């Protein structure tokens, strides 16, 4: 639907069209033209595109929407986008309706169990990530020995892991959770192969996610890569 969508989807989609996310009017016109009344959002559009100056300028409808916002936090922007769709008779559904099967239940997901130190860091990191999410800033925290190494903001999960992992000098624990007031229609927390690759690069040792509320994309590849690199993953 928007820039960044994998091209492979063309092969499995009944209809495929790439539209720059800044072109809100075009997105709505396309959906209405196809008589779409229900949508489910998949993936994430980073706010970085609003500030980089390297992307297509927003259309009149997007400018009007952005100008009406009290702030540009994730929830404020996404709720406004959902409301704009609703004005046109388009309902946005809960992402978990289709993706519940890739949200793991509580437990250790990898072959290696966490150490006592990692367990303590996972509990600490989980709490810190929840607090960060409560401020609607990010969903990821990197910790070591109950000290916060990095908090996710606009840079995204992978950059946060790289920054925090380097500061930790190895054996960091990454926590990724849903916000306390998470709206399941958009921006559900997700981890994937790139998450593990980032952890490998900085020699992070553990990942804790929120059970039943975090998506694992390409689960088999994620767990295999984690096992190969002695990374422990826990759904808490």
What is the role of each PLM region?
Residues 1, 41-43, 143-144, 176:
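Short beta-strand segments
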Residues 5-7, 47-49, 99, 149, ...:
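Short, active-site-adjacent cap segments at secondary-structure transitions
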Residues 3-8, 83-93, 97-109, 231-234:
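Catalytic domains of riboflavin
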Residues 21, 71-75, 91-196:
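Conserved mixed alpha/beta catalytic, RNA-binding, or beta-rich assembly cores of soluble enzyme
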Residues 24-98:
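N-terminal glycine-rich phosphate/adenylate-binding segment common to multiple enzyme folds
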Residues 44-46, 147, 179-180, 213:
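Active-site-proximal loop/turn and secondary-structure-junction residues that shape catalytic pockets
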Residues 2-34, 53-66, 158-236:
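Feature captures the catalytic cores and cofactor-binding loops of soluble hydro-lyases/lyases
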